[in-house]
């Protein structure tokens, strides 16, 4: 495991899923809640490390983080003859924090949406395409309350380097991103 991701997690969670099919329509949804602790994180005070690497904020102290996560998703599909259309959306939010120095407060939001269509091309295959959109943001605020001094905060840029200009006690970062994409799929299906 990566030191930046920590050495363990203790999480309680609730996960509720539903699927309803009525006639040619299908409807599904999910709601999830997690609460717990991420242990032993070092050189990283930023949430979603694997998504944001190498542009993360870190320090030499690190430690355990309390985490609370929410996730909601849902979708709808409709089949008419050999054609199927559908849409799905999801939103995830996370807060990570620590009550001892260094004290990060990370708030994330991740919105994702997909639409797609497929049609049966013969007796054994379906051809489909889809479009995807994602919007992500994170507010990262790192504070110290120790009056005796604070360690340097590093704004890493990858390959062991950091923004020297921002090194010190400045512990605020804001991440914002968007992505768009698409896919084409050829899938076998049982014609029976």
Language model regions located:
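Transmembrane beta-strands of outer-membrane beta-barrel pores
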Residues: 1, 33-37, 78-80, 91-95, ...
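Residues that define the transmembrane beta-barrel architecture of outer-membrane proteins
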Residues: 8-14, 66-72, 105-113, 176-182
